[in-house]
Amino acid sequence: MKFLPLFLGVFLVLSASARDELPPVTTVSSVDLQEYIGTWYEIAAIPQFFERKCVGNTTAEYALTPKNQVSVVNSCETKSGKLSIAEGRAKIVDPTTNAKLKVTFVYFLGWRYLFGGDYWILALGDRYSYAVVGSPNRKYAWILSRTPELAPSLLSEATQALTLQSFDTCNLIFTPQKGGHQERTPLCKTPIGL
């Protein structure tokens, strides 16, 4: 009889933690890499250590390589006004959808994906006007656009895609862009259209 309270306590703790588990992150059903390559402007992102010098005008340039990888060139403006550039590679992890990639910026006698990060394409706008990218652990997320400013209706769609995947949109911060949003404010605190 002494074990009944202990059993009930363990059961309640396990039940509560099971309810708190988030559903797995899912990707789009397919990505046409020919449509995806090109220049993307960072509209909002979860701040990362590798972007700590960046103050705005952050872009990513993607191109296909002869080895069926994606060349990645990220650039941003620093506080001093200089351009910071990082080159990397992405390999396709799920060739049936092209929606899961592994990105690395480590090159030593070849690109080292062991140190790479998950780059999952979670949502795409019509004609690839925007992309929502994240990681399965929800520690990384970006809203990317083909233009420095994303129309309010498209920003709303992209934000909703993150919310439906249980990302905390307060963790995403707007990236200042010339011709776009100018303040580093949380995505969740900024009314759509400002």
Question: Would you name each region that the model predicts?
Answer:
Residues F3-L194:
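A beta-rich soluble binding module of mature secreted/lumenal proteins
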